[in-house]
């Protein structure tokens, strides 16, 4: 249970998230770094699937760009106000389970205010953030890597729900999320590992 889960919005920080994946995978190994929960076998509960995927990791990186808080859907509704928003589900699952959440600010973004977040995400505003940028990529991501190294070498704690996280590496949990999903529904992002969820 030593995986790193990268949570991000495609229309907000996809460029940063993809580059960050490559940097972390090169340092920690591709089998320990995951990004995207975007598809799941028909008939499975996607909320449960996201919680299982997140719980297989030791730390969740919340990549926050300047549209992370106010991004809207096609109808103009703020995505964070949707209980089924993937970012809300991913981050909320990590906070609920006591998984370490590291906010990573990109593109000049600032931390959201608690008043602007749904109840289950308000604790995110109390997490110390790291800022990364393309101009100082090696230095800023180096700080993040040192933080992750410190987290991953620390023994895991019991989750808020009283359940002990799985000891298996995150890569083994792809199949736990959706049975045979790893074999027939995985998507790719460069060399990234992704859980595929139906659109």
Q: Which positions does each model-derived feature cover?
A:
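Conserved N-terminal substructure of TIR/SEFIR domains
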Residues: 1-77, 83-87, 91-99, 107, ...
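Cytosolic linker/terminal segments flanking nucleotidyl-cyclase catalytic modules
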Residues: 2, 12, 18, 91-95, ...
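Short, conserved catalytic or adaptor-binding loops enriched in Gly and charged residues
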Residues: 26, 116-126
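Extended interaction regions within the primary functional domain
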Residues: 61, 104, 117
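A cross-family acyltransferase "interaction/gating" segment
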Residues: 108-111, 115-118
